[in-house]
Regions:
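Post-Walker A helix-loop "phosphate-sensing" segment adjacent to the P-loop in P-loop NTPases
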Residues: 79-88, 111-115
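Residue-level preference for the first positions of well-ordered beta-strands
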Residues: 57-59, 88-90, 140
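Conserved nucleotide-state-sensing and coupling region of NTP-binding domains
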Residues: 92-147
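N-terminal accessory segments
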Residues: 1-55
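Short, solvent-exposed loop/edge-beta patches enriched in aromatic
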Residues: 50-56, 82-87
Length: 149
């Protein structure tokens, strides 16, 4: 990827979720080296198939520290909203602190200059809730709403 022009690199990030996720990892963990592995490629391919509508249900079951959260709760919502600013994405977590961190990390990706160069998607300026953010096209990444009477 060293001989690519910036336009070519951007096109790859737009079209290949695996490379996009790797860029997200590097942005969020500048002190760590990304270690490519087959399981990351498989998850990235399955998530890309979800976005394309080829897979309707997907469970990712791996031990901790295998990039599940980065791939499925940070990079994937950002990539989907980049391609479809009206997409409606629910992100669920077992803990509030983790849910807040994942939402902040996803938002931080979406406001970076390189993301804004890749996609036309913009976050609505009037929404500043930690976990929920809305695009200017009414798409969102949000926790599920509790059901009530």
């Amino acid at each position: 990827m060293q001989d690519l022009s910036p336009r070519e690199y951007d096109a790859i990030l737009r079209s290949d979720f695996g490379y996009f996720a790797q860029r997200c990892f590097c942005e969020l963990n500048p002190q760590a080296a990304f270690a490519p592995n087959w399981h990351i490629e498989v998850i990235a391919a399955k998530l890309a198939a979800v976005r394309q509508g080829k897979i309707r249900r997907l469970i990712i079951n791996l031990p901790p520290r295998h990039l599940k959260s980065l791939l499925a709760s940070i990079a994937f919502p950002a990539w989907c909203l980049g391609h479809d600013p009206s997409a409606q994405i629910l992100c669920v977590s077992y803990a509030q602190d983790l849910a807040d961190k994942l939402a902040r990390d996803c938002r931080s990706i979406m406001i970076r200059p390189w993301y804004r160069r890749l996609f036309l998607t913009r976050l609505a300026p009037h929404r500043h809730a930690v976990q929920e953010f809305i695009t200017t096209r009414q798409g969102y990444r949000s926790p599920p709403r509790p059901a009530g009477c």
